[in-house]
Amino acid sequence: MRIILLGAPGAGKGTQAQFIMEQYGIPQISTGDMLRAAVKAGTPLGLEAKKVMDAGQLVSDDLIIGLVKERIAQDDCAKGFLLDGFPRTIPQADAMAANGISIDHVIEIDVPDEEIVKRMSGRRVHPGSGRVYHVVFNPPKVEGKDDVTGEDLAIRPDDEEATVRKRLGIYHEQTKPLVEYYGKVAAAGNTQYHKFDGTQSVAAVSEQLASVLK
């Protein structure tokens, strides 16, 4: 079972990825983790990637595709894999197809932008312990204070509203076209495309996922 998971930052992909991995015994392949592992292992592609990254440049699609092919040939991918954060663009999706990497299911978790902004910009963290609160969904007993220590809570830079909106803008510009792309691939009968409402409870989304991934 070869799966691609699409969705904006904050849509709940990580939680559902965990569910899929546990339910179906397939590894989650994140390009970031894969790059780090290849660099650490000192593989030819890893060394090439390190050279590019050390120069402060972006790793090319060809190099990433090479790493993906190398990774999915490993034993733990025998039953399939879950690609997270890749492909991000249509050229990357084209390159995957050209390299014979076929996909069984493309899953989109759809959450409106305003809901994502509310979810992410409402997060508060206790820097000392890493405890996470939310002003709406999981508020501390005393506003702005950690329940255990009474110390001030902070907003992570990634959760600042302006940052969240910027990341959403990049997602819509780069990744949203993939929704249309894979819709066409599915219409041609070459993959299955599933769209889920990510504003539902985690359990409801997991249940719906399980019903289509049988």
UniProtKB/Swiss-Prot annotation:
<dbReference type="InterPro" id="IPR006259">
    <property type="entry name" value="Adenyl_kin_sub"/>
</dbReference>
<protein>
    <recommendedName>
        <fullName>Adenylate kinase</fullName>
        <ecNumber>2.7.4.3</ecNumber>
    </recommendedName>
</protein>
<dbReference type="Pfam" id="PF00406">
    <property type="entry name" value="ADK"/>
</dbReference>
<feature type="binding site">
    <location>
        <position position="167"/>
    </location>
    <ligand>
        <name>AMP</name>
    </ligand>
</feature>
<comment type="pathway">
    <text>Purine metabolism; AMP biosynthesis via salvage pathway; AMP from ADP: step 1/1.</text>
</comment>
<dbReference type="GO" id="GO:0009132">
    <property type="term" value="P:nucleoside diphosphate metabolic process"/>
</dbReference>
<feature type="binding site">
    <location>
        <position position="200"/>
    </location>
    <ligand>
        <name>ATP</name>
    </ligand>
</feature>
<dbReference type="GO" id="GO:0009123">
    <property type="term" value="P:nucleoside monophosphate metabolic process"/>
</dbReference>
<feature type="binding site">
    <location>
        <begin position="10"/>
        <end position="15"/>
    </location>
    <ligand>
        <name>ATP</name>
    </ligand>
</feature>
<dbReference type="GO" id="GO:0005829">
    <property type="term" value="C:cytosol"/>
</dbReference>
<comment type="similarity">
    <text>Belongs to the adenylate kinase family.</text>
</comment>
<dbReference type="Pfam" id="PF05191">
    <property type="entry name" value="ADK_lid"/>
</dbReference>
<keyword id="KW-0808">Transferase</keyword>
<keyword id="KW-0067">ATP-binding</keyword>
<feature type="binding site">
    <location>
        <position position="31"/>
    </location>
    <ligand>
        <name>AMP</name>
    </ligand>
</feature>
<dbReference type="GO" id="GO:0005524">
    <property type="term" value="F:ATP binding"/>
</dbReference>
<keyword id="KW-0547">Nucleotide-binding</keyword>
<feature type="binding site">
    <location>
        <position position="36"/>
    </location>
    <ligand>
        <name>AMP</name>
    </ligand>
</feature>
<feature type="binding site">
    <location>
        <position position="156"/>
    </location>
    <ligand>
        <name>AMP</name>
    </ligand>
</feature>
<comment type="function">
    <text>Catalyzes the reversible transfer of the terminal phosphate group between ATP and AMP. Plays an important role in cellular energy homeostasis and in adenine nucleotide metabolism.</text>
</comment>
<dbReference type="GO" id="GO:0005737">
    <property type="term" value="C:cytoplasm"/>
</dbReference>
<feature type="binding site">
    <location>
        <begin position="132"/>
        <end position="133"/>
    </location>
    <ligand>
        <name>ATP</name>
    </ligand>
</feature>
<keyword id="KW-0963">Cytoplasm</keyword>
<feature type="binding site">
    <location>
        <position position="92"/>
    </location>
    <ligand>
        <name>AMP</name>
    </ligand>
</feature>
<keyword id="KW-0418">Kinase</keyword>
<feature type="region of interest" description="LID">
    <location>
        <begin position="122"/>
        <end position="159"/>
    </location>
</feature>
<dbReference type="GO" id="GO:0044209">
    <property type="term" value="P:AMP salvage"/>
</dbReference>
<comment type="subunit">
    <text>Monomer.</text>
</comment>
<feature type="binding site">
    <location>
        <position position="123"/>
    </location>
    <ligand>
        <name>ATP</name>
    </ligand>
</feature>
<dbReference type="InterPro" id="IPR027417">
    <property type="entry name" value="P-loop_NTPase"/>
</dbReference>
<dbReference type="InterPro" id="IPR000850">
    <property type="entry name" value="Adenylat/UMP-CMP_kin"/>
</dbReference>
<dbReference type="GO" id="GO:0004550">
    <property type="term" value="F:nucleoside diphosphate kinase activity"/>
</dbReference>
<dbReference type="GO" id="GO:0004017">
    <property type="term" value="F:adenylate kinase activity"/>
</dbReference>
<dbReference type="InterPro" id="IPR033690">
    <property type="entry name" value="Adenylat_kinase_CS"/>
</dbReference>
<feature type="region of interest" description="NMP">
    <location>
        <begin position="30"/>
        <end position="59"/>
    </location>
</feature>
<feature type="binding site">
    <location>
        <begin position="57"/>
        <end position="59"/>
    </location>
    <ligand>
        <name>AMP</name>
    </ligand>
</feature>
<dbReference type="InterPro" id="IPR007862">
    <property type="entry name" value="Adenylate_kinase_lid-dom"/>
</dbReference>
<feature type="binding site">
    <location>
        <begin position="85"/>
        <end position="88"/>
    </location>
    <ligand>
        <name>AMP</name>
    </ligand>
</feature>
<keyword id="KW-0545">Nucleotide biosynthesis</keyword>
